[in-house]
């Protein structure tokens, strides 16, 4: 089996972000990096990853540091293929009433229990991604068992 890896264009990355719903949020914790899964939406008008949060360590770490990384991916373990998109950017609480109303209209369902009254946005500084695809062995690589 051979594989090929290629970089994704920004447009491909944004499309994958828009089509997915769960990713991993990475922030610097007090003593070590902290990575948490979050369900999210991609807000097209602001080109931002948005999610709900409750007051607590993750929320306050985001606002205190004003920076985070966010990763989303898709993997096919049988086909040995997949993709990954990483967003790095500034974090901010969304407080503008018009923006909050627009985000409420995205239909982001809350997965985790508890009240999550705060909207957080990651405004992307960088968006990058990669895709790996695998091809079955064949005559071209000399491994045809036919």
Descriptions of predicted regions:
Residues 31, 57-59, 136:
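Short, surface-exposed beta-strand-loop junctions and turns on beta-sheet-rich folds
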Residues 1-19, 146:
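Extreme N-terminal tail/first-helix region
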Residues 43-45, 58, 94:
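Short coil/turn motifs at secondary-structure junctions
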Residues 21-23, 36, 45-47, 64-68, ...:
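A generic structural signal for short beta-strands and their flanking turns/coil linkers
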Residues 8-11, 52-53, 59, 105:
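Charged, amphipathic alpha-helical segments
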Residues 20-54:
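Short beta-strand segments
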Residues 2, 73-146:
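Charged, gly/pro-rich active-site loop segments
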Residues 51-66, 71-77:
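Helix-adjacent hinge/juxtasegments
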